[in-house]
Amino acid sequence: MRFMMIGKANQQSEAGVPPDPRLMEAVGKLGEEAVRAGTMVASGGLAPSAMGTRIRIGGGPMKVIDGPFAEAKELVGGFAIFELPSKEAAIEAGRRFMALHTEIMGPDFESELEIRQIFGPENFHR
């Protein structure tokens, strides 16, 4: 089963402030471990929404809207795609990732990770 882990943006990432180097090193090591284990398919951080564009349809002509976009907590800051046997395994991988943030940034650091299964053609057959 494939899962996408979606890291929410925060005010610092939206301002283009790079993450703490200690956190990046720890996350890099965790990612390398997952790649070696064959569980991480892809990962990446996203540029601030000020560099992004949305294309919206409905209620009239198509609209192209340049960022920045409001509500940083609703924006995606990064992602990882994993191949794992179950949702429980995905939750455990997500917990390990988030635990690094608490260990390095401290207990007051706030962040959110959303885990969603990626559907393939087999999920749409009736």
Name every feature range the model reports, one short phrase each.
Residues 1-126:
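Conserved, structured core segments of small domains
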